[in-house]
Amino acid sequence: MAERCQRIDEEVVASRDEISSLPDDLLIQILLLVPIKDAVGTMILSKRWRYVWTLLPKLEYSDPGDECESVWKFLEKLLELHKAPFLETLCIQLDVGKLVANAVDRFVRKLELELHWTAEPTSLPKSLYTCKTLVELTLSDKIIVDVPSSVCLPSLNILRLFYVVFKDENSLERLISSCSVLARSKVGLAISDNRDYRFAKVHKLRLEKPHIDVVCHTDDKFLKAISLVTYLVLPLEDPMALDFRGFTFTRLGKLVICPHGHLWLDIIPLILNNSPKLRFLAITSVMDIDPEISHCHGTNQGTVPRCLSAHLDEEFVWHGYRGNEEETQLIRYIFANAKCLKKREISTFHLEEREVIETVLKSMPRVSTTSTLVFK
């Protein structure tokens, strides 16, 4: 009698679980209809179900607002255990705002956030702009910088903004003004998003060590707005040739130029003329500049820039010097007019012409008889 009851129970269970007897292909199609977490959860039903989910050809995850740490652990384990011959689709949708808010709630100190260039512009939670523990903040691509009036970032000392979208013309000013210990600021503008914005108020900021890295095309509004910086890293491109007329970098002491295009040699004399207190000048060239198309007409001006005659006393550095006619004209101009210069450091890409270039440089007349020449 007991054996008969047991056999009946087994038959009932078997009839209730007929779905488990279906082939893998059908079970996979069924699991594709449910959320990925539910599909993974079927592994505890029985041995038959333990590995079915690992054969799914598509993995789609939509953030339900879970804790960010558990989300990434789940996704990592999901891919680690996945056994399908081909993964046709991997789609992960996360709520960036929730992730950032969770990070702020956990007293984040360093936050780097970059969106893919195809993503929709995304705003961040207001709590980010009142995070008291945040020391370093990097925002890149398609992030809307919408800074509330209540912004307060007392610990922030490194700020990097690359190709972000400013909500309005006051957002940048409010953000930087709220950082009482900000020592270094790297600011990049996507002109397609900011062309009509005015940055007139940015120049009123007083940073202890203003340091701006301009990492994309800029217009004259932005350059004028940062005209009180003391340290500037500046990529020079052809369209920027006219941006340096009509305003002055009154406090600029250190300038690093990264040339691109073919008109950059013409732009440098304009910058020197508008930087009266410059003490350090570096040029970092790249390999792909065509030396045959470069020009340098600005050195023919009658008046020597004040920075050359009175202030450029620390160092002149040129990495990637080629020694062509136009570059030689510029470097000869600097050597002949930098009265206070203490050190000159030159390096070249053309190792086969190193000795010739070094000989030419050493033979150039220089007004500062005490300056040393280091050739690398």
Swiss-Prot record:
LRR-type repeats, residues: 131-154, 199-224
Domain (F-box) ranges: 16-75
Q: Which InterPro entries match?
A: F-box-like_dom_sf, F-box_dom, FBD, FBL13/AtMIF1-like, LRR_FXL15/At3g58940/PEG3-like
Which keywords does this chain's UniProt record carry? Leucine-rich repeat, Repeat
Q: Which domain of life is it from?
A: Eukaryota
- What residues does the FBD domain cover? 296-348
Protein name, UniProt field? Putative F-box/FBD/LRR-repeat protein At5g52460
> Which species does this protein come from?
Arabidopsis thaliana
